[in-house]
Swiss-Prot record:
Belongs to the glutamate--cysteine ligase type 1 family. Type 1 subfamily. It is an enzyme of class 6 (ligase). Gene3D superfamilies: 3.30.590.20. The keyword Nucleotide-binding applies. It comes from Edwardsiella ictaluri (strain 93-146). This is Glutamate--cysteine ligase. Keywords: ATP-binding, Glutathione biosynthesis, Ligase, Nucleotide-binding. It catalyses: L-cysteine + L-glutamate + ATP = gamma-L-glutamyl-L-cysteine + ADP + phosphate + H(+). The lineage of its organism: Bacteria, Pseudomonadati, Pseudomonadota, Gammaproteobacteria, Enterobacterales. GO terms for biological process: glutathione biosynthetic process.
Amino acid sequence: MIPDVSQALSWLESHPNALDGIRRGIERETLRVTPEGHLATTPHPAVLGKALTHPWITTDFAESLLEFITPVDGSIDHMLTFLSDIHRYVARNLGDERMWPLSMPCFIGSEQDIILAQYGSSNLGRFKTLYREGLKNRYGALMQTISGVHYNFSLPLSFWQARAGVQDADSGKAAISDGYFRLIRNYYRFGWVIPYLFGASPAICSSFLNGRESALPFERRGGTLFLPYATSLRLSDLGYTNKSQSNLGITFNHLNQYVEGLKRAIHTPSAEFARLGVEESGHYHQLNANILQIENELYAPIRPKRVTRDGESPSDALLRGGVEYIEVRSLDINPFTPIGVDADQARFLDLFLIWCVLADAPEMSSDELLCTRQNWNRVILEGRKPGQTIGIGCHDARQPLAYVGQSLFADLHRVAEVLDGINGDARYQQVCARLVAAFEDVSLTYSARVVAQMGERGIGGYGLTLAQHYRDRLCSEPLALLDETTLAVQAQRSVTRQAALESQSCESFASYLRQHAGG
């Protein structure tokens, strides 16, 4: 089940400096809510600057869905301190509102209460809001208010020089991209370990279904619906998985094939979405009627990425420079910390992603890619079930989940020793020891802890209590890295940048759409 990585680990142990210089970044989403937990209907607070142009404080789907972005960082502790400062600053500037501490929203009356994120009158700003209008019309607005954490990760050039024999990032871009695609294939095969350990959405408010039927066999406790062994309902079909994408045939074997599949999806008309219409009397319903409006609409638990240049699409950036980093998208909001993610999770992801790039990863057909989803679904819906098993490949053979998890951690511990040697401490090994215990004792998983702490209050009461507690805590903590002046200057710069974009928008929006979305 677990590939034999003993040779690769021995290589790593003899080349420890190859891992010196890992870079990371975090994106954390959170809904603004009222003291009663209802979705805020107020505009994005002006004191925070403009969501379109602020580098650290922006919005995602909804005007009330905040997104905090850390700069790229070589230190986990520094990165999380930066993220904490953003939370402290925002908490002080939300008035009565607070940040919802769970992935799944709760007290939403109707989809009409969800206001799309607003980005001003520039063509870029209108484009971003229209993309969200399309998502709402295609999949419903409620699905888009689910929050998560994204972990961006890149290995240093020294790793690729030692492991793949590349000279520099430019001439070695093909080998580096191949390495990251190997990582992605292993992530699809073994990434279910993330919702097993860290899934924190085993229950939802019944209002989330909004009267819709669900095929899931929910149990009810007051206003809470839950599955007894679930880990991450956010990653289930309740969340945003876009079933229409399952037939796209996009694979993760080679960069060119991946980009080709992506481009095919954004240029292939969809009869279903065509019925929504694109434009009527000057009012737009979506960017276009293709399977994907733009590349970001592709649902994926992990993405290959490169920083784009102005006007460049994500896939064109990949073709130009190869894969620069990967974005992990399977983390629920961690409700046990005010900032939604902690150092143990970051260190685990470092270890796991390094393991994924070292382990052999045979190429995967689109059928096998779908097949890996079965293990994910098993863990998402019944991960804590006693005696739970994991499928091996696309065959009928199974192995106990606990055994596979413990085998994986035996490898991760060796990676941890290398990283601890670089850092001169034992923190990665300590994380391994803490987390591997969850395969023997499921009560240590995040989802089990949520169920235990939720108790009779239900998920809504639990979220409200945490939201108030974290608001009080964040407002009382001093800034550690940033200061009020720096944050105020960034906010003002974002206002200036948005104003400049709006003054430059002389091209008609229809023309802009044709150029950027084939509209």
